[in-house]
């Protein structure tokens, strides 16, 4: 049997579930929430017509999905060596040879190209922000910082917080204070979220020689960093006062709840893994609740 035939068989075995793994669909979906919220708030706060903005919102979501999925696929291509070492990554199609490198790269660059075309069709700022997100995630995070510094998570938070900016700019064409506030929410959220995950997988990261903060500096140092980011996040809702006092109060309570949960780790004999799991779950719910709340509150202003 020829090598080409074997490779074609490999790619033919990639199903939809495996494709979702390749493009990290869970991560993409999580980022689409703030992207949509950014676009929606731009529609409401700048008095755009919702009906006339629907095509822009859909094109923005489609383009964002493609560039994020393509960047994640490229990340999977680059990380194959360390993924083969980490037990939790063994089911990835890129690890068990369910997709060839050639097809993986074609998928990645194809998605990013089409995604960028979509964003540039909206306006130049959207396309530029998309490019910044791609370069930041692939180059500064995946290729450089992830393998060389414990600041990798913070560095990766910059491109990770771009989606709400793209959403806003797709409608308004320029960045505003509200868009920056949404960016800051996602930016501050990411270290807490990913440090919690890294605590649970610190042995895996150490095995793969990835300098994640818990693996290099230990649990105590990591929880202090998480708490610092929680404190930084606390006043950010004040920047969204134009959504009303009710939103600011509810968002602040959401932040205070997270801080309260974070403080439980300073009790004696607290279970590190259990606490990290609780913080991780809260982080997932936080992002959804925060941005859904922003959308709902903005809807009430239209009634």
Swiss-Prot record:
An additional note in the Swiss-Prot or TrEMBL entry is: Carbon 2 of the heme B porphyrin ring is defined according to the Fischer nomenclature.
Q: So where does this one cross the membrane?
A: 25-45, 54-74, 104-124, 125-145, 151-171, 179-199, 227-247, 248-268, 280-300
Compartments, record wording: Cell membrane
Pathway assignment: Porphyrin-containing compound metabolism; heme O biosynthesis; heme O from protoheme: step 1/1
Primary gene name? ctaB
A GO cellular component term found in this entry reads: plasma membrane
Protein role: Converts heme B (protoheme IX) to heme O by substitution of the vinyl group on carbon 2 of heme B porphyrin ring with a hydroxyethyl farnesyl side group.
The molecular function terms of the Gene Ontology recorded here are: protoheme IX farnesyltransferase activity
| NCBIfam families registered for this protein in UniProt | cyoE_ctaB
Q: Which reaction does it catalyse?
A: heme b + (2E,6E)-farnesyl diphosphate + H2O = Fe(II)-heme o + diphosphate
Might you name a Gene Ontology BP term for this protein? heme O biosynthetic process
Membrane topology label: Multi-pass membrane protein
Question: What keywords are annotated for this sequence in UniProt?
Answer: Cell membrane, Heme biosynthesis, Membrane, Transferase, Transmembrane, Transmembrane helix
What is the protein name for this chain? Protoheme IX farnesyltransferase
Q: Which family does it belong to?
A: Belongs to the UbiA prenyltransferase family. Protoheme IX farnesyltransferase subfamily.
Please give the superkingdom of this protein's source: Bacteria
Matching entries from CDD domains are given as: PT_UbiA_Cox10
Which EC number applies? 2.5.1.141
The record ties this protein, via Pfam families, to:
UbiA
**Where is the major localization of this protein?**
membrane
């Amino acid at each position: 049997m020829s090598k080409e035939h074997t490779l074609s068989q490999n790619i033919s075995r990639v199903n939809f579930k495996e494709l979702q793994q390749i493009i990290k669909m869970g991560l993409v979906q999580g980022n689409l929430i703030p992207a949509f919220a950014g676009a929606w708030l731009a529609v409401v706060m700048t008095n755009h017509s919702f009906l006339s903005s629907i095509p822009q919102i859909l094109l923005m979501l489609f383009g964002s999905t493609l560039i994020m999925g393509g960047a994640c696929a490229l990340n999977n291509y680059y990380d194959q060596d360390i993924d083969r070492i980490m037990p939790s990554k063994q089911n990835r199609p890129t690890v068990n040879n369910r997709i060839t490198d050639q097809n993986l790269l074609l998928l990645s660059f194809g998605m990013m190209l089409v995604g960028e075309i979509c964003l540039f069709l909206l306006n130049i700022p959207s396309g530029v922000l998309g490019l910044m997100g791609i370069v930041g995630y692939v180059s500064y995070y995946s290729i450089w910082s992830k393998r060389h510094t414990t600041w990798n998570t913070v560095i990766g938070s910059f491109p990770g917080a771009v989606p709400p900016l793209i959403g806003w700019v797709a409608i308004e064409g320029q960045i505003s204070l509200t868009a920056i506030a949404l960016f800051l929410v996602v930016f501050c959220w990411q270290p807490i979220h990913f440090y919690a995950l890294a605590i649970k997988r610190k042995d895996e990261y150490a095995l793969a020689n990835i300098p994640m903060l818990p693996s290099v500096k230990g649990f105590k140092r990591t929880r202090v960093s998480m708490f610092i980011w929680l404190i930084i996040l606390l006043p950010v809702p004040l920047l969204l006062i134009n959504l009303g006092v009710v939103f600011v109060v509810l968002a602040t309570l959401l932040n205070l709840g997270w801080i309260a949960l974070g403080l439980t780790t300073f009790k004696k004999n607290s279970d590190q893994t259990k606490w990290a799991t609780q913080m991780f779950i809260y982080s997932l719910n936080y992002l959804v609740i925060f941005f859904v709340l922003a959308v709902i509150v903005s809807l009430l202003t239209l009634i």
